[in-house]
Amino acid sequence: GVIKPLIIGHQADLKPSTNPFSAIVRQPLASPEPEPEAMQDPTLGVAEVSESVTQVTPTVPTSPTASTVPEAPEVPAAPDSLTPPAAPAPARIPTAATTPAPAVPEAPPVKPSKVRKPVDVDKLKAELSEWGAWASMPQLGSKKPQDKKKSKVGGPSLVYRFPGDSQVLQEVDIAVVMESTYPFTAGDTAVSVQNIIRHNPDLTFGVIHIADNSNAPAKSMFELPANVKWVDVIYLESTEVSEKFSGLVSSPVTDEQVREVLDAIESSVTGNHEPMHALYENAINPQTRTWSAWGALGHREFMNAAIKAAGKADDISLSQLFDLAYNFFLRIYTLLDRVLPTARVYHAHSSGNAGLVAAAGAVQNKGKFFLTEHNLNIRDSINKLLSRDLNRRVTSEAPLKLTTDTFERFWTQWWLELGALNYAEAELITYLYPQAVTDAQELGGAQEKAEVLPDGIEWEDLEIPRIWRQQAVPKLERKISWKLAVVGDFQPSKGIIELIDAVKIMVDGGKTDVRVDLLKPTDGSTTDEPEYYSRCVAHIKQLSVENYVRLRDVKDARDVMHEYDALVVPSFQESQPHAALVAMTMGVPIIGSSVGGMNALVTEELSDAQHKKIGASGELVPPGDSAALATLMAKLTQSPELYRAWHENALARIKAFYLLPQVMRRYNAIYRNLGAGKHKVIGGMAMVP
C-alpha cells in the first residue's frame, strides 16, 4: 500500500499512555520445591540436584558474551555457605565502575531469627586456594585507566567526568544516553545524535556514555556543539566495582526481602513492573534504598527459584547456574548503583543497557524517559547471541523455539525482559521506519507509544555534487564503464563477501564494464573487524576480481559519492544508513539488500503532502543472494530510462520525507512536551504558559 507522508510537528500533547502496558505473558519462575538436607556436587546437572543452601555465592562467575557461551570450570562440592573474594568479571558481560554514588546504606535492624548468618570469608578463601579455581580465571579491569584526552570543543564549561571523579554536573534539558557510540565513536547513530544536538541550540544537553572499560575510545569524533555541557562516562568492566559487588552479595537480608526480590522478577516476567519499581526504590536506588537487594542472590529461596526456572536441564551445573544469576545481578548493579546527573528528559538511543540507565535517571530526578530505536537492539542482541543473521525475526517465543541450551535460554529471556521493561517505562518511542514498529511489538513494544521519525539530511549542503550528478544523467547512453560504491564497516553483517561473490558471477557472465569500490573512510568513523577485513582482501584475490573490486581510502565518503553511478548496500541488517541518505540527496540510486528500513527508504511507494505518488529510488534483493545482486548490478547499467526514474525519485523522496529541518522541529517539540526548555510546544509552535 501507499505509506502516507510523515506529518512532523503536529502531534498533540504527549501524555502517559492511558492503556496499561501489556507485555506478552511468559512462563514465570515456579515456587521452589522442598529441599533435601544433603548438598550435592555442584558439577552435576541441575536436573540431578536439589539442595539445602543456607547461603551461596559464586564459585567462578563466567557468562556468555553477546555471541559466545564460555564453559564454567569444574569445581568440587561447595561448602555450606560461600562468599567469594573479589569475583572475576566475565569476559564481556560487563562489570562497571560507578560514577560517585552514596554508599550502600546498612540494612535496618532486623530480628536475628530472620537474618541469615554471614559466611566466614577467610575460611572460604583458604578452600578456594586449595581448589585452585580462582587462580585460573581472567581478571578483567586489571589495567589502570588510561589517561583520558579531553575531547573536542563543546561549550566553554564543558566537563568530562570519568569513573572515580566526584565533580557535580550541572542540570541540563536532555541527557542523551549512548552505549559505545557518541561522541567517542562515529557511525549512523552518532551522526544522528550530533545533528539532534546541533539543531536544537535552544536546549542544553549532556551525554551519558556507557563504555566497555577504561581502554575504550575516549577522544571525541565530533566537534561538540556549545550546548553540550558535560560527558559522563560509565564503565561496564571494573575490578573495583566487581570487588564491591562480591562483598554486597553477603549483605544480610530477611526472608521477606528475599521474597520481595523474587516477586519483582516473577511479576516482570508476566508484564507487571510495579513490584520492580518498588524494589528499585527500596533496595537499589542510591537515593532511597534502605537495604541491599544483592544479598538475596546467595540464599536458599532465590537459588531454588533459579533451579526451578532451569527445569530439568542437564546441560548446566549448580555452580554454573549460580554464576549465570550472579552475572545478571552484577550487570544491573553496574548500571544502576549510581546517582545520575540531573536532566528533564533522558533520551536513550538504544534499548537494553542505555534504556535501563535512562529509565533510572528519569525516576531519580522526576524526569521523562524517551527512547529512540535506531535498530532493534534487543532483536539484534538475541540474534548475535544465537549466531543468526541480524535480519532474522525474533519474538517472545525465542527462549523456547530458538535456543539450544540453558545458557542461551536464560540469556535470551534476559534480553527479552530487559527490552519489555524499557518499552514499558518509556514515555515515547520513536523508530526510523514503519516495519520497526511492528517488529518491536513482537518483543513487547507498545504501539500506542510509537512514532515513526526518520533521520534527516541537509539538502543545501550537497547542492554542488547534486548538480554534478544531474549533469551526468543525460550522458548515460554514452557510458562505457560504470562505477558503484559501497560504504560501511568491514563486518560480516555488511555482506562484503557476498558482494564480492556477486561481482565474480557478473564478470563470469561477461559483464565487465562495472567496477565496485569499497570506500574505507580514514577519519575513524568505521569499526572494522580486522579478521573480516583480511578475509575480504583475500577473497578478492582468490576470485581474481582485483580489476573489478577495489579498496579505496577516502577521508569522507560524501566527498566522493558524486563520482559513482549507484550505492550498493549488501548488508544483512540496516535501519536507515546515512550513506544512503547522502547518495539519494545527490540523486544516486540505491541497490542492495531488502532488510530493515531499506524498503521504506528505497522501494516502498510513498505519497507526498500533495498526495503525489513517489516511486522507487532503486531496487533490493534478498540478503546474501549473490546471484540476484549480480543480476541487479547488471540491470542498473542496461536501462537509461529506469536509471533516470530512480535518479528523480531519489531526489523526490528526500525532499518529501527526509529533510533535516522538519525532522529537527519534531525532536524539539517532543523534548519540550516532555518537559525540556521553558515553553510547551504543540504542533511545532512554542506555547508560553
Please describe what each predicted stretch is:
Residues 401-405, 529-554, 566:
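Nucleotide-activated donor-binding/catalytic signature segment of Leloir-type glycosyltransferases, i.e.
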Residues 460-461, 466, 472-494, 500-505, ...:
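Conserved donor-binding/catalytic core segment of Leloir-type glycosyltransferases
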Residues 589-592, 596-603, 610-613:
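Short hydrophobic beta-strand element within catalytic cores of glycosyltransferases
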Residues 604-626, 635-640:
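Conserved acidic donor-binding segment of nucleotide-sugar-dependent glycosyltransferases
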Residues 628, 635, 642-657, 663, ...:
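A short, well-ordered alpha-helix in the C-terminal region of glycosyltransferases
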Residues 515-534:
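Glycosyltransferase donor-sugar binding loop
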